[in-house]
Amino acid sequence: MKYSRDPNGIYIASISGGKDSTAMTLLLLENNEPLDYIITAEIADFPEALHVIDKLEKISPVSVIRVKVDFEYYFKDYEIKNGKYKGYKGYGWATLTSRWCTSLKRDNIHKTVKELANGKKVYEYIGIAYDEINRRNIDSNKLYPLVDNKMRQQDNLKFCYSRGFDFEGAYNHLTRISCYLCPFSLLRNLYFVYSQYSDLWQYMLWLDQFSRFPFRPNETLSEIDRRFRKIAKQRKLF
């Protein structure tokens, strides 16, 4: 893989602090690929992901732009302007038909990138793994280093480990380390928050009172909390 620089373009790496985008960024830096900015939008991220961004900031020769997104404001206070819930306060928990937090993250990144580009053509590196190639968006402005190098998710994790990025062991327990309060997370990921980050779990329970939607269509967060309490109690017996 070697990308040619467009003298009239700007090159951005969008990262989350997870294994794939981190492997991509390290690969770009090691191969001295065209790269002007590394950018991330921080919105209810696992601490391990934030620590990865901290570490990248220290070693990267290019600027790392951290866009802060006020998740709590949009969750409970933002006045909805359109649609069925126009006039309501806060989006509440994301649903299958309203993954607003994903859109908010993407829109904040795009807004920042547009400001950085200042009229130049934007080339964006996307950390999609080779075994997730179906997620790729065919666009001349989108670049997929992991796909081009046929690096699968497990390859990416090993690559990060070999470069000293171990995610503090998070991938021994989690499948993903992006948003810790995502309703679409696997139960094992949620249990990790419950058992390892009681402060974040309590924050989720506090947020729950402001949502007009249950955490999941068939289960409230309080019900999940009660289930986790039973599991924790049973584990203490052995």
List where the protein language model places each region:
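Nucleotide-activated chemistry modules centered on ATP-dependent adenylation/adenylyltransferase
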Residues: M1-F238
